[in-house]
Amino acid sequence: TRYIALCDYLKSEYGISVKDVIPEEKKPFSKIYQKNKKELLLSDYSSLETKKLHAAAQIAQEGSDKEIEEYLTKFKFPSDESKKLTKVALLNYCGAAILMPYKLFHSECKKLKYDLELLQNTFATSFEQVAHRVTCLQDPKLPGIPFHFLRVDMAGNISKRFSLSGIEIPRYGGACPRWNVYSALTRPGVIQAAVSKMSNGEKYVGIARTVEKGIGRFGQSKSILSIGLGCEAKYAKEFIYSENLNINDKSTEIPIGV
């Protein structure tokens, strides 16, 4: 599998051994890199897709750490912690690029009209990873649709947000309860598509679907999150989920606020 190939690459190129381990109950973790032992510990409670991303991100760190550190010197950070989090985000971006190479991924997105489940199957990644990756297709020479992306928990709190579509996503707390990213929580695993209209008149096509984090195991329940992805209505013909929607039917528009 690709996971085995990534682990083999880490071992052959950088001498890093990947070990799948069961974390102690009071010390949960998803990933730990023990630099002195050159061991990457990955939790057996993480999904295979998450493990692949961690392994790919470690490859990115080993191969591009100097370049990333130089890039970070261009910015001022309010704290060391914020700089550390930014570096983690960059490494995860690079890891996703290893799993879903830009040109190939862009080509498949165009061919499949951003069908996230087909893309998920093609690249053997998770629904959330694919949804996040489509927001990164912003090379001026080979651009994709400018999407917005958000992730919410069962309590309605936004834990991830990103917007290139122009829609405003609250920085703190939750968003408008009429967004389908919330109604999706009532129908787990089902993709919901809708046309939304903001108070300023802008229209968006958006989809939402729940995802499960981690893997099921005895005595523990998986956490449920909802992923929302959308774009301006003018891109509807390029977005497969708009095919059963009447973009011009005002009666089906869902008025939403921030």
Residue spans of the language-model regions?
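Conserved binding/catalytic microenvironments
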Residues: 2-258
